[in-house]
């Protein structure tokens, strides 16, 4: 399906130069002189290579339609994730590299959404937030104000995040999986 380049969004799958690409980032740039253009960072689905491409906002690109399917993560088998279809209980292998930076947030029995193009997996979406435990947190530096100061902390999955000074080791917090940022203390 053809669409204007300025409608490209992260997560979409497009066809360009005879290859399939998944869009990682996009930014519309409006220079002081001349027309606006869109800068797109994308990854080749077959080779995994990344590239940047620029289009004028009026250009058209071929967007591939994706099917979204719900699966449950079972376990990791080498370089693949084993997912289970909740309706048919069939197991489905997906390359682990599709997760990218979100891989540490994958937990047993987590519900995930897999994007498929003609039956081939092209992307995995985790829930927007996960609850994890703080295993290590720096002490609060005396004299810091609570309004804008954050301190580093290490989560149970090994990811480091910046948390408010009142958070201590042993507490459970909610973390945004997209960018590894602190959201709030876990309730309950």
UniProtKB/Swiss-Prot annotation:
Q: Tell me the disulfide pairings in this chain.
A: none
State where it is primarily located. Answer: cytoplasm
Record-linked CDD domains? S1_EF-P_repeat_1, S1_EF-P_repeat_2
Q: In which pathway does it act?
A: Protein biosynthesis; polypeptide chain elongation
Annotated compartments: Cytoplasm
Q: What's one GO BP annotation on this UniProt entry? A: peptide biosynthetic process
Question: Which keywords does this chain's UniProt record carry?
Answer: Cytoplasm, Elongation factor, Protein biosynthesis
| Listed GO CC annotations | cytoplasm
Query: Does this UniProt record's set of keywords contain Protein biosynthesis?
Result: yes
Q: Name one GO molecular function term.
A: translation elongation factor activity
Note the Pfam families from the entry: EFP (PF01132), EFP_N (PF08207), Elong-fact-P_C (PF09285)
Name it: Elongation factor P
Q: Which organism is it from?
A: Acidiphilium cryptum (strain JF-5)
């Amino acid at each position: 399906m053809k669409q204007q380049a300025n409608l490209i969004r992260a997560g979409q799958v497009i066809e360009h130069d005879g290859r399939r690409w998944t869009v990682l980032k996009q930014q519309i740039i409006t220079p002081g002189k001349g027309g606006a253009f869109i800068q797109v960072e994308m990854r080749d689905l077959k080779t995994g290579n990344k590239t940047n491409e620029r289009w004028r906002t009026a250009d058209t690109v071929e967007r591939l339609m994706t099917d979204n399917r719900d699966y449950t993560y079972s376990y990791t088998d080498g370089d693949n994730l084993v997912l289970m279809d909740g309706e048919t209980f069939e197991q489905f292998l997906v390359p682990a590299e599709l997760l990218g930076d979100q891989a540490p947030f994958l937990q047993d029995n987590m519900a995930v959404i897999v994007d498929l193009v003609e039956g081939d997996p092209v992307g995995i979406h985790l829930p927007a937030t996960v609850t994890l435990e703080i295993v290590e947190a720096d002490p609060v530096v005396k004299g810091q104000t609570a309004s804008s100061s954050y301190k580093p902390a290490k989560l149970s999955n090994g990811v480091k995040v910046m948390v408010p000074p009142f958070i201590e080791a042993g507490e459970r917090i909610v973390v945004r999986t997209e960018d590894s940022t602190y959201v709030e203390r876990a309730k309950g």
